Structures are given as C-alpha cells and as structure tokens.
C-alpha cells in the first residue's frame, strides 16, 4: 500500500497503525475458515493464526525513507523531523506461519508513504508447473484489490488470436463497480462505522488479538528504534526503494515489469514475440 501524499508524519503511532492494518489483511487471507460468521468465531481464528506466526526477523526486512524529488520535500525536510531521524516511511517484511497449511510459504507485506500510487491489494502468486509447455511466460496470480476500486482478478496467460501459438498475459476480471453498477458500494469507513452502530465486532481487534499481533511486530520496532535495522532511501513519488524487487525475489516472488492492469490491448505483445 502507498500514497503520493504523506498524510502526516509516520512516528511510532504511524508504525503501529500500519502494522495493525497489515495484520488484519494478513489474517483474513491466511486464517482457517471460522465455524460461523459470528464475530467471536472469526476473531478466534485470527488469534489462532497470529499465535502460529513467528516474530519478524530483522534479516527479512527492507526499510526506506523518502527523499526530496519531483518538486516535493523529503521526510527530513520537515522542520518537525530531527535531521538524524531513522523513522522508516517504507517497509517490506516477511511473515512465516508455523502450521501445516502454510509452513514454508512466505507472506510479504509492503507499506509506504509518498509512493507513486495509493492502493491496498493482496497478491497470491502461483509457482510455475514442473513441466511448462510454453517458455518464458509470467506467473499466474490471484489479486484482491481492496482499494481503490474493489476488484478480484486472475492474472493468467492466454493464446494470442490467430495462427501463432504464442502466449500473452491477460486477466479474468471482477471489478465491483462494473459488475454492480446500480448498487451503492460504501467506502471502508462507512462500512466500519455501520458495523460499530449495529454491534458487529468481526472487523474490530480483540485484546488477545492485539497482544498476539504485538508479539510479532514489537521486537522489530524495538530494533528499529535502537538503530539495529539499516534503511535505504527512495525518491518521493517513486515505487519504493531500488532494492525492492531484489528483496522480494529472495523469497520467490517474480515481478513482471511489462504487465499493467487492466490489460486491454494484448495485441501490443505480438511485436515482442
């Protein structure tokens, strides 16, 4: 997730907020199916998952702090920020779950300020089959776009129309605003406030869930405060630190730099095949 506007300076409170928000998305993706839609059943599964998640290793973290670029000031250019501040404005980290379902599968969480776009999404990238019929195609992905423009789409590869057997990237797309054109889709905080008014607790953090979450994140935050975790810089309005692609590649994620979503003109790939 990221935003072109800093939206305030991410002091310790900002770090905590980002951690809790990321933890909620992580839980909803990885937790076991609850016994029912009852709020306590859902929150029980969140707590169970968090207790099975290992504390974040400082060796599996990439931190960044934005600098002045594109006519915008850097983080330390703010008069209220100490010139020697080591507060990160970007973080990529890896979570590991120690249970039979997810053991060995890395979960990469990324969040930052002053990036090129603001979005929240979940990307499940699938490995290539052991015997792949078509060489050099991008991996398939299931993408859940939380905001903006809620959507679920599957990145896949399809045969280019015509006599050629070449494969090109495409997607199966369910964008909510297109599928449900005549229905009002509430904003995130609208739905949350309505849940609060109606006494629905499933989207709110329980005390034991918060404690389990901090057992994962707090050691890392202490290490950052003590200057034990180095950080790099990135320009305001960029997609993050230069080493980001190298970092995620260490954990098996492959970034397809040529892919855009939504893809409406796959014919452009014909000249590159």
Where are these regions (language model features)?
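Secretory/organelle targeting and membrane-embedding segments
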Residues: 1-273
